[in-house]
Design a protein with these regions (language model features):
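ABC ATP-binding cassette signature C-motif
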Residues: 1-200
Length: 200
């Protein structure tokens, strides 16, 4: 199944041609590498596919409903939080659901609640949705992905501002993996990964 394609992509700045007549197609499950020397336009091509840069000419097709994740070489974070806080942003919807669940639990614990039946039905529906979305497993998934990228429990409270460039790249990759985009594009992410991380 075709999930992404490009046809006759060109990009130029004035008289400087960066990319010329690039065409390709990617099917579901494909793993594709873009190979070329520095300055060949690899990053420019990725930014065009991600929708962050307009081609001078040509077309990019992304299958309807598909989410594209794009990990850049630099400028990963502007956050002043910690490692665990940044990674946990992926699961904001679960935290919101948990707050609503807690509120409904208080409501249905009061048998004199005039909206008891309505709140109970809402609670049951929300719990089913929470379970189906992975609410009981996301915390272990979060910890596991961070560990796979070299962030053990002792680093979770480390300020992002204190991370090295390589650590920021690894954290950005972990966050991207947690988001589970349909199409994942990585711009030289292996520069700061060891063999174990690459295998994972």
């Amino acid at each position: 199944m075709l999930v992404m394609s490009a046809k006759d992509i060109c990009k130029s700045y004035g008289t400087d041609i960066i990319i010329e007549d690039v065409s390709f197609s990617v099917n579901k499950g494909d793993k594709v590498g873009i190979v070329g020397p520095n300055g060949a336009g690899k990053t420019t091509l990725l930014s065009i596919i991600a929708g962050e840069n307009e081609p001078t000419s040509g077309d990019v097709f992304i299958r309807s409903g598909y989410v594209v994740g794009y990990l850049k070489q630099k400028d990963h974070f502007f956050s002043e939080g910690t490692v665990i806080e940044e990674a946990a942003k992926t699961f904001t919807h679960f935290y919101e659901m948990e707050e609503e669940i807690s509120s409904l639990e208080k409501a249905i614990s009061d048998t004199n609640n005039p909206k008891f039946d309505q709140d109970l039905e809402a609670y049951t529906h929300l719990m089913d949705e929470y379970k189906a979305m992975g609410g009981y497993s996301y915390k272990s998934e979060l910890i596991g992905v961070l560990a796979s990228m070299g962030f053990g429990a002792d680093t979770h409270d480390k300020e992002i501002s204190m991370l090295s460039g390589g650590e920021k790249t690894r954290l950005a990759l972990a966050c991207m993996m947690l988001q589970k985009p349909d199409i994942l594009m990585l711009d030289e992410p292996t520069n700061h990964l060891d063999l174990k991380m690459l295998a994972w």
